[in-house]
Curated annotation (Swiss-Prot):
The keyword Transport applies. This is ATP synthase subunit alpha. It is a peripheral membrane protein. The record marks S362 as: Required for activity. GO terms for biological process: proton motive force-driven ATP synthesis. It catalyses: ATP + H2O + 4 H(+)(in) = ADP + phosphate + 5 H(+)(out). ATP binds at G169, D170, R171, Q172, T173, G174, K175, T176. Keywords: ATP synthesis, ATP-binding, Cell membrane, CF(1), Hydrogen ion transport, Ion transport, Membrane, Nucleotide-binding, Translocase, Transport. It comes from Clostridium botulinum (strain Hall / ATCC 3502 / NCTC 13319 / Type A). Belongs to the ATPase alpha/beta chains family.
Length: 504
């Protein structure tokens, strides 16, 4: 075989020209221990706290413990097939989730991956899961109401856009029901809703999604689900992921409502992770930074200043108590972080008062500024009258003779309690709430039998819709009860009452 020197030269020249000098440096480490969803990695000298680490089998982990000689990572997937000695790589990114309009109407997991079988989420935008909360200058005060459609809450414990209002109570007292009704009441109000399920049963989440779909609420709702079968790190990430999805819309100038259901299970997931990472336990075996865990999440809810678009993120965190004990660690922490709490009692629930709101210890610390004037006018004395009724009711059980004034108060109180009862999935427009509460507070219902109150309420709305349609419009337009409007309301209620009483 005859090879010419020129050919050899041209081949060598060609190879030199095509030689690629790109050198890629990969910061890698070695797994020295793995188990219980926790991996200890040797190496990764320049690793960041909260950084994504790439493990074999397309599994990612999150670096949480940066120690002197190793890095403690939590796995965001199955540890199957991963063993000691495997090489892991840094990604130089922190955990982020997809955000955008494409998520609305979808059910996703803590990492923003769809789990509803409707195909991929078509969005290119992402946002870090952990973002600093807006500063004092970037916020404005809460001044616009977020109507829940629940009479007891909108009147006595009003919620404003940008507020954090805790829903707290024992299991099976209707905490999720209040959050669901609030989501349903946002229909047609241009509010994006996000429901974050943390550590719930899959059947419960499926039931909630089914109900939201049936009521047409999935058109403006995102469900972030991290069920009981998910690992602790995924349950830990879920609320932060949901919050990032909400912040995207908030920075676009929109109003967002986010429900965290529930933060007790979130704290348990964080406790599991912390103990496995060998962090020292504190009270109730929770780590020392469990307060910061929830404060940095809830502080991200805000009403942004007009300069930043004026969007808002309203949070309804849910916390479960054991036997009504609000002095436990997590309940006291979250109560001190939020701007008020709605306390639900199992005794009231079992007595048939639903929603089972205890008006005595439930408060809204900033929502009063957001209430419309008409609601303030009718609800001003409501809390006091209910408190007096409870005191009198307890006193009257001893069978003592009561004077006329006390009997009158008792009868009025019974009717107020009856008016505040409301079935699930039936949120009420604010103008109707004002009409019926006005009727109750102004002694119009005193001669209606207690067992006929619900029937009276339903038929009164039908009567006003037919004969006095402009009353509702006037309330919404003026946002206050003028003397003229009051006399019109009195006339409408009295006209209907005469018809109603004649038919009983």
């Amino acid at each position: 075989m005859n090879i010419k020197p020129e050919e050899i030269t041209s081949i060598i020249r060609q190879q030199i020209e095509n030689f690629n000098t790109n050198i890629e440096t990969i910061d890698s480490g070695t797994i020295i221990q793995i188990g219980d969803g926790i991996a200890r990695v040797y190496g990764l000298e320049d690793c960041m706290e909260g950084e994504l680490i790439e493990f074999p089998n397309d599994v990612y982990g999150m670096a949480l413990n940066l120690e002197q000689d190793n890095v403690g990572c939590v796995l965001l997937g199955s540890e199957e097939g991963i063993k000691e000695g495997n090489v892991v790589k840094r990604t130089k990114k922190v955990v982020e989730v997809p955000v955008g309009e494409a998520l609305v109407g979808r059910v996703v997991n803590s990492l923003g991956m769809p789990i509803d079988g409707k195909g991929p989420v078509l969005t290119t935008e992402t946002r870090d899961v952990e973002v600093p909360a807006p500063g004092v200058i970037d916020r404005q005060s809460v001044k616009e109401p977020l109507q829940t459609g629940i009479k007891a809450i909108d009147s006595m414990i009003p919620i404003g856009k940008g507020q954090r209002e805790l829903i707290i109570g024992d299991r099976q007292t209707g905490k999720t029901a209040i959050a669901m009704d609030t989501i349903l009441n946002q229909k047609g109000k241009d509010v994006i809703c996000i429901y974050v399920a943390i550590g719930q049963k899959q059947s419960t989440v499926a039931h909630i999604v089914n109900d939201l779909t049936k009521m047409g609420a999935m058109d403006y709702t995102i469900v972030v689900s991290s069920t009981a079968s998910d690992s602790a790190p995924l349950q830990y990430l879920a609320p932060y992921a949901g919050c990032s999805m909400g912040e995207y819309f908030m920075h676009k100038g929109k109003d967002v409502l986010i429900v965290y259901d529930d933060l007790s299970k979130h704290a348990v997931a964080y406790r599991t992770m912390s103990l496995l990472l060998r962090r020292p336990p504190g009270r109730e075996a929770y780590p020392g930074d469990v307060f910061y865990l929830h404060s940095r999440l809830l502080e991200r809810s805000a009403r942004l200043s007009e300069k930043l678009g004026g969007g808002s993120l309203t949070a309804l965190p849910i916390v479960e108590t054991l036997a009504g004990d609000v002095t436990a660690y997590i309940p006291t922490n979250v109560i001190s972080i939020t701007d008020g709490q709605i306390f639900l009692e199992s005794e009231l629930f079992n007595a048939g008062q639903r929603p089972a709101v205890n008006a005595g210890i439930s408060v809204s610390r900033v929502g009063g500024n957001a209430q419309i004037k008409a609601m303030k006018q009718v609800a001003g004395t409501l809390r006091l009258e209910l408190a007096q009724y409870r005191e009198l009711a307890a006193f009257s059980q001893f069978g003592s003779d009561l004077d006329k004034e006390s009997v009158k108060r008792l009868e009025k109180g019974k009717r107020l309690v009856e008016i505040l009862k409301q079935p699930q999935y039936s949120p009420m427009p604010v103008e109707k709430e004002i009409i019926i509460l006005y009727a109750a507070v102004s002694n119009h219902l005193i001669d209606i039998p207690v067992n006929k109150i619900k029937e009276f309420e339903k038929e009164l709305f039908n009567y006003i819709d037919t004969h006095y349609r402009d009353i509702g419009k006037d309330i919404l337009e003026h946002k206050q009860l003028t003397d003229e409007l009051k006399s019109k309301l009195d006339k409408a209620i009295n006209d209907f009452k005469n018809v109603f009483l004649s038919e009983i």
